[in-house]
A protein has these predicted regions:
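Nucleic-acid endonuclease domains
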Residues: 1-55, 59-206
Length: 206
């Protein structure tokens, strides 16, 4: 079983789904980026579009659920209540003061992917070890929504407007990070070119 847990596991699930979606949508060379250099630059995957290689930061967000009974089940760690917010990391590590991924990313685009998974963390981790036909048949993504955000305009907007939003501590992958929780209407009014792709899981499962 994969050793990833928590936000790292959710991130790996999101990257796997998005790569499959891009490949099915006419970008056959879409692939996850796993080397250390891309990791340091917050680049999670890449694909070719209009003759150019596009690099992507993926942000997975489990706050997409709407079923109260599933939200109440604490063992369903990846089924949190939908909020209509963006979570943007302003500080990656309280101790080292490393800037968050918004500032550090060298990607061209942010793929902000909300997904609610109606399974336990252990069930999700076990499925990550399975081949694609099993993974995509059995992973219980109940709701999902993809937004594609141009990274440079986002970084410029966040540098100017980020302080308007109260910071919130988040424990992620053993680090104490800080996030700004931004209403989606604010971000999408301030950053030109946001694409509301919508649900993609149905396309990769078909």
């Amino acid at each position: 079983m994969t050793s990833a847990r928590g936000s790292r596991l959710l991130h790996e699930v999101a990257v796997r789904i998005i790569v499959r979606y891009l490949q099915s949508a006419g970008y056959p060379d879409a692939a996850a980026s796993t080397d250390a250099i891309n990791g340091a630059q917050c680049v999670d995957l890449a694909y070719s579009r209009d003759g150019a290689r596009r690099r992507v930061t993926v942000k997975a967000d489990s706050y997409a659920g709407v079923d109260p009974q599933k939200i109440a089940r604490r063992e369903m760690a990846f089924y949190r209540p939908s909020t209509g917010m963006y979570g943007l990391e302003s500080l990656a590590d309280t101790f080292s003061r490393q800037p968050g991924w918004v500032q550090r990313s060298q990607a061209d685009e942010l793929f902000y992917y909300r997904l609610a998974i109606a399974q336990t963390e252990d069930e999700v981790a076990a499925l990550m070890d399975e081949p694609d036909d099993v993974f995509f048949a059995e992973i219980a993504v109940e709701r999902d929504d993809l937004r594609v955000i141009p990274m440079r305009p986002l970084q410029q907007w966040f540098a100017a407007a980020g302080e308007r939003y109260a910071p919130r501590p988040v424990l992620t992958e053993g680090r104490s990070a800080w996030y700004r929780i931004v209403p989606e209407a604010d971000l999408e009014a301030g950053v030109a070119g946001v694409q509301r792709v919508g649900s993609i899981f149905a396309h990769v499962r078909a």
